[in-house]
Swiss-Prot record:
Subcellular location(s) per record: Secreted
Protein name: Pregnancy-associated glycoprotein 70
PTM comment text: N-glycosylated.
Main location: secreted
Enzymatic class: hydrolase
Keyword list, A-Z: Aspartyl protease, Glycoprotein, Hydrolase, Protease, Secreted
Entry's family note: Belongs to the peptidase A1 family.
GO BP: proteolysis
Coiled coil stretches, renumbered: none
């Protein structure tokens, strides 16, 4: 979440 990874599918596990 705002980690920057929000553009990656990983956002589903870090949301």
């Amino acid at each position: 979440r705002g980690s920057x990874l929000t553009i990656l599918p990983l956002r589903n596990i870090i949301d």
